[in-house]
Amino acid sequence: MSQLTHINAAGEAHMVDVSAKAETVREARAEAFVTMRSETLAMIIDGRHHKGDVFATARIVGIQAAKRTWDLIPLCHPLMLSKVEVNLQAEPEHNRVRIETLCRLTGKTGVEMEALTAASVAALTIYDMCKAVQKDMVIGPVRLLAKSGGKSGDFKVEADD
């Protein structure tokens, strides 16, 4: 079984030393969902929200969140991301918004946390912008879809049925 990399022999949390690692291209994709009433989703799709374009705002906030992950999660390294992508898609058949993020860099540590943070904070932004019309929206699940690069190898979730 793998060991927890952020816990030392004394059981103390610490930031992993990546100075000896080779720089490789690393990429991660994550997703999050925000489920809401059909009327709330229609308001977003039709651009009738009084606060403005919900998707455009969530996209920009998600990008900013990926870039600030190190500031939110203390044991994450500050990274020079080369790409952050945040895509939002309305899924009216499920009364929800799907958020998919992609983060990429050439570096010594992975970008899974950045992709997950981008998806999570974009979802929180949708909630924040729409809470005046619906407070019982549900955020989740949030999950890593895939990662590549680095010593631990590639990961990809199994296709959903």
UniProtKB/Swiss-Prot annotation:
The catalytic activity of this protein is classed by the Enzyme Commission as: 4.6.1.17
**Keywords in UniProt for this one?**
Lyase, Molybdenum cofactor biosynthesis
Read off the Gene3D superfamilies from this record: Molybdopterin cofactor biosynthesis C (MoaC) domain
One GO MF term, please? cyclic pyranopterin monophosphate synthase activity
Keyword hit for Lyase: yes
Q: State where substrate binds.
A: L75, C76, H77, M113, E114
- Please list the residues that make up the active site: D128
| Subunit record text | Homohexamer; trimer of dimers.
Q: Which family does it belong to?
A: Belongs to the MoaC family.
Protein name, entry field: Cyclic pyranopterin monophosphate synthase
Species name:
Shigella sonnei (strain Ss046)
